[in-house]
């Protein structure tokens, strides 16, 4: 039997990258999946909804639409996020870029938790997975200051909620991927190959993660197999955060 049979799972940012792979893995494990994206173009889902997750009223309406279709909500994967190329050093990044990144990367998680967690509580609990990043626990000279700050906020928010709701049946964890081979990252690094090379050299495994590897971690956190895990910084970074120097060869 699949690990998510009988569970209703909401995935934001479901149309591409980690979100799309997570939709596929959740479906393979028996979940009913609601795919949420800026446009209703999520593939392979049971219900596709268009929602600007940085808009509070839109998020509230999204959850109402889900409950109109399903009796419960069991898993929230708050995964939507942006990393615009204009986001760079604090000396260069415009305030408008900062604000846009915080709106999409932080406010969206706040809104989805604010309006989603009550539905989990109503039916006895569930799992909330918020996509943070390895940059929430490490610094980088190749700065993306708005993105880094936003993911630090998601990490702190997740830890707080994980503790707050621990005895009410709702687990909340921050999923912290390392660099992932997604359209978003590939587009960013195509514009700046030097930035890509400077990051790749620090990865002990010598490669970026594949989106399905992050999706598998989300699947674990969504399932009852992770029933004693909450308020965690769940790193899936190929050893990056634990490395000082990296192997020269595969010997």
How would you describe each model-predicted region?
Residues 2-33:
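Canonical Rossmann dinucleotide-binding motif of NAD(H)/NADP(H)-dependent dehydrogenases/reductases
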Residues 87, 219, 230-251:
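Short C-terminal tail/terminal secondary-structure segment
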Residues 87-90, 94-99, 199:
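Substrate-binding pocket helix/loop in short-chain dehydrogenase/reductase
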Residues 113, 150, 158:
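Active-site helix of classical SDR
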Residues 118, 163-167, 227:
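Alpha-helical segment proximal to the catalytic Tyr-Lys
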Residues 133:
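Residue(s) in the substrate-gating loop at a strand-loop-helix junction
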Residues 174, 194-225, 229, 236-238:
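C-terminal helical subdomain
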